[in-house]
Structure formats: C-alpha cells, structure tokens
C-alpha cells in the first residue's frame, strides 16, 4: 500500500505523464523469509511467492491509475523497463496465441542471459502484458545483434510477439 500511495501522491500533485519502474522489485540477496513465513499461506515456492507479490502490486497500482485517469480525464501511464530477457530457452520462429491474444509460445527467447522471471527479480512481465496492467514495456535491449547470450533481434522479436494483440506499447530501450 505504501508504494501505491506514494505513486498516487506523485500523480495527484505533479503534472506527470507516467509512473515508470526500472530495475525494480527484489534486490539480489534479499532475505524475506519472515515475510514468506507469515504470508505464504498457499505454500508457494520462493519464485512463485515473489512473483505473486509483485503481480498484486502492479495490478493494484494499475487499477489506481486507471481510476484516477477516468475520474480526472487524464492519461497517466504505467510503464516498466525490465531486463531484456523474460526467460531463457528454446526458439520458435512462429508465435502462437490463445483466443484472448495472449502469447502461448514461445514463452522463452533464444537466449542464455540474465532472465527477470526466474532470477532474483521474480517479475512476470508477460503476465502484466496479458492482463494489460501496464501501458508500455521498454525492455533494456542493450546487446548487439551478434551477442551470443542475448542477441538484440531475438529479444526484441519476442517482446513484439508478446504485445502484438495487447493494448501495451513496446519501446526499445
């Protein structure tokens, strides 16, 4: 609630275009064992628990911003700038979607670099895109076309597939 309230205080008191998160959420080595012990009533794994907490935050902030925008005839956006790799894995040249336009495959990019879904950030940005909780995504695609771990073209292609049928803009960072 504190972070959502802080964001809304900024939105309500300053003429801004967006709330933007960059290099966000869980820091490397964070010990939240006492929090998990108290609130993890579903027995989720560390990764699933953390992703759920971040999902709940993003959804809550999104709902607050949409309500504010509707009430005040504004268009303050919510944006995220994640690391360029969602998840590592195999490659497919043809995306597949469900009836809601959610990307079902590939859920992994043809990469071997740091991935924010599993590594310590535990952020399910594809879920945020699928639910349209964010207005834009600006992945940190800083690698060259020839980078062997996270080639630019492979990363940006996967992101373009993820937003194809969603009301989420893709900006290359």
Name each region found by the language model:
Residues 131, 145-173:
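Surface-exposed substrate-engagement region within the catalytic domains
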Residues 1-133, 142-143:
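Polysaccharide-binding and catalytic clefts of secreted carbohydrate-active enzymes
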């Amino acid at each position: 609630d504190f972070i959502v309230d802080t964001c809304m205080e900024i939105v309500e008191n300053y003429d801004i275009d967006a709330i933007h998160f960059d290099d966000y959420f869980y820091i490397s080595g964070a010990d939240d064992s006492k929090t998990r012990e108290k609130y993890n009533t579903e027995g989720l794994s560390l990764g699933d628990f953390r992703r759920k907490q971040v999902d709940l935050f993003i959804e809550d902030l999104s709902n607050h911003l949409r309500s504010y925008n509707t009430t005040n005839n504004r268009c303050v956006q919510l944006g995220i700038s994640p690391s360029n790799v969602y998840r590592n894995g195999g490659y497919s040249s043809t995306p597949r979607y469900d009836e809601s336009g959610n990307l079902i495959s590939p859920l992994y990019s043809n990469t071997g670099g740091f991935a924010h879904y599993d590594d310590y950030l535990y952020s399910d940005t594809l879920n945020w895109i699928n639910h349209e909780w964010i207005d834009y995504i600006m992945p940190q695609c800083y690698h060259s076309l020839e980078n062997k771990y996270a080639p630019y073209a492979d990363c940006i292609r996967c992101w373009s597939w993820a937003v194809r049928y969603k009301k989420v803009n893709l900006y290359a960072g």
